[in-house]
């Protein structure tokens, strides 16, 4: 399942928001009824994980951490301690808890951004600004993708 594109929506007074139909249809087609919501580690946005993607992330993280290492346990605890299990109501809405609205600086207008196997939820005001300048984007992409170490020049 690959989520692509972006969509705008508004939260209501209770913090409920409609999951865009394009993403909802993908989840239904994959029989994913449950989503996991957490604050992004690096940005002021929220991340929705389909349950199967969340489980893969948890397994990957758990495999890299030692249960008997206190620092590893602290990292794991921090990663999983503040998540919400989300289910859509009959209208395709879900509740964003108030603490998450505050963490992501969401007032009312939101932008959903499909980011491969997850969906980000941004404050529209923040998402309206470029994440990176076009020049820097081009340079970074060139650096990452522009060299192919597997190609031999004859």
Curated annotation (Swiss-Prot):
Cell compartments where the protein resides:
Cytoplasm, Nucleoid
Give the record's keywords alphabetically.
Answer: Cytoplasm, DNA-binding, Repeat, Transcription, Transcription regulation
SUPFAM superfamilies attached to this UniProt entry: AbrB/MazE/MraZ-like
**One Pfam family name from the record?**
MraZ
Per the record's keyword annotation, is Cytoplasm included, yes or no? yes
Determine the domain of life of the protein's source.
Bacteria
Location (main, coarse): cytoplasm
Q: Where is the SpoVT-AbrB domain?
A: 6-53, 83-126
Single GO molecular-function term? Answer: DNA-binding transcription factor activity
Q: Which GO terms describe its biological process?
A: negative regulation of DNA-templated transcription initiation
Q: Does the keyword Transcription apply?
A: yes
Cellular-component GO terms for this entry = cytoplasm; nucleoid
Q: Note the subunit structure.
A: Forms oligomers.
Q: Which family does it belong to?
A: Belongs to the MraZ family.
Instruction: Identify this protein by name.
Output: Transcriptional regulator MraZ
Source organism per UniProt: Phocaeicola vulgatus (strain ATCC 8482 / DSM 1447 / JCM 5826 / CCUG 4940 / NBRC 14291 / NCTC 11154)
